[in-house]
Amino acid sequence: MRLCVIGAGYVGLVTAACFAEMGNQVRCVERDRERVARLRRGEMPIYEPGLESILRDQLDAARLTFTASLAEGLADAEVVFIAVGTPCGEDGSADLSHVLAVAEQLGAQLRQACIVVNKSTVPVGTAERVEEIIRLGLARRRKRFRVAVASNPEFLKEGSAVDDFRRPDRVIIGSAETQAGETLRQLYAPFLRNHERVLLMGRREAEFSKYAANAFLATKISFMNEMAGLCALTGVDIEDVRRGMGSDKRIGTHFIYAGCGYGGSCFPKDVRALIRSAEQQGYDSQILRAVEARNARQKELLFETLGELFQGRWQGRTVALWGLAFKPGTDDLREAPSLVLLEALLRHGVRVRAHDPVANAGVAARYPEAVACARLTLHDSPYAAVEGADALVLVTEWKQFRQPDFQKIRGSMRTPLLVDGRNLYAPARMAELGFIYQGIGRPRAGHCKASAA
C-alpha cells in the first residue's frame, strides 16, 4: 500500500520503517527540516535497538522516504497515519494541538479519498473531532470524496519497539466504517501470519483502551512499590513476595517488580491525562490519583536512603549513578527517576559521577552548568564512574550492570555503599563481598552506617 506517516518521532519512525520493511511505499512527513536531512542520510535521532538498520535498508530500497512537505507526503496516499505528540497540558490533560493542527492541514491538502489513522494517544472522542475538522476543510474546498478516520493506538515499549511492532500482542483498530477496518486489517496481516489478534471495535473504545492499558500497568508498579514500603517496615523481602505472587497465573510475572518508580513518555502522561479526563466528567479517580502519588513518592526514596546511610552528612560526598535513562534499551530521559535523584544530590552539594550506556549526552545537555563546574561528570565506563565514590546507586537495570566485577568496584570506592534501586542484586551476596547493601523493600545487609566524609 501507499502510506503517509505524519511525524518522525519515536512512534512515527518505528511505524514508517516497519511498514516499509513489509513492502509498502512509505513517505514520512516531518516539519523539522534538520531532522529530515539527518534521516535521509540514515542517521537516527533516537536510540532504539534494531531501528537504524531497518531504516537504512528501507532507504536503500527506496521504500521509505522523508520529506518536510505534507503535500508531497500525501500524494497518492491510501492510508495516512497521524503520529504526533500529545504532551500533558498545564492541567494534566492531553494537549491535542498537534493532532488537531494536522487535521486542519489534511482538510486543506488532501486530494483523494483515503483512511486517516490516529496512532497518537488521545482522549475519547478525538477521532470524531479529527473527522469533523477534515470534513469541514474538504467542504470549504468543495471536495466530495470520503475520508474515513480510524483509531489505531500503538502499544510499543521503548527498547523493544521494533519487535513489538513486528510481533504484536494485539492490534486494536477502532473504526466506524467496515471497509476502513478491513483495509487496516489487511495492512497489518504480514505481522499476524501465525496468529489473528486484530481487535475491531469502535473508535472511542480503541482510544480508551490505550489509556486503560497504560494506567493498569502503572497501577501494578505502584501497587508493588506500596507493598515494598510495607515490607521494609516489617523485615520482609519484597523479592520473595514477588516470586510468590508471580507464580499465580492470575497475576503473572510482568510489571510486579518493586523499584524507584516509573517514568518515560507514556505512563506518567497517560495516568495524568486519565485523571484529568475523570475530573472533567465529575468522576473521582481515587485509584489513579493514588498510583500517581505513590510513584512520585517512590522517586524520592533513593535520596532518602542515601541520607540515612550518610547520617545526613552530605558535605564532601561523591555518589556514583549507574543508569540515567528511564528504562533499559532507550536514551529517553523523560520523567526518569534518575533525574529526581540527580537534582537532589546537586542541590545538597554532592559530586555526582554517572554512567549510562546511551543517555550520557542527554544528561549533559540538561545540566550544562553542573558539567562545566565538574559537579557532574559523565563516564563511558561504569567502573570509571565509581572511582572514589562514597556510594553507588543503581537506578536503571541495564543488562551490563547485572554481573559486574564487584571486587573491582569495592576496591575503587571510598565507601562500599550500594543502593539498589531495581533490586538487581542479592543482599546476602553483597554483604559477603563487603558492601553495605540497601534495596527497595528489602532488609539492609552489611553494616548499617557509613563513616563521615
Curated annotation (Swiss-Prot):
Active-site residues, as the UniProt record annotates them: C266
Enzyme Commission (EC) number: 1.1.1.22
Residues engaged in binding substrate: E154, F155, L156, K157, E158, K210, N214, F255, I256, Y257, A258, G259, G263, K327
Annotated InterPro entries: 6-PGluconate_DH-like_C_sf (IPR008927), NAD(P)-bd_dom_sf (IPR036291), UDP-Glc/GDP-Man (IPR017476), UDP-Glc/GDP-Man_DH_C (IPR014027), UDP-Glc/GDP-Man_DH_C_sf (IPR036220), UDP-Glc/GDP-Man_DH_dimer (IPR014026), UDP-Glc/GDP-Man_DH_N (IPR001732), UDPglc_DH_bac (IPR028357)
Key words of the record: NAD, Oxidoreductase
GO biological process, one term: lipopolysaccharide biosynthetic process
A single MF term (Gene Ontology): NAD binding
Gene3D superfamilies named in the record: Cytochrome c1, transmembrane anchor, C-terminal (1.20.5.100), NAD(P)-binding Rossmann-like Domain (3.40.50.720)
Superkingdom of the organism of origin: Bacteria
Signal sequence range: none
Family membership: Belongs to the UDP-glucose/GDP-mannose dehydrogenase family.
Protein name in UniProt: UDP-glucose 6-dehydrogenase
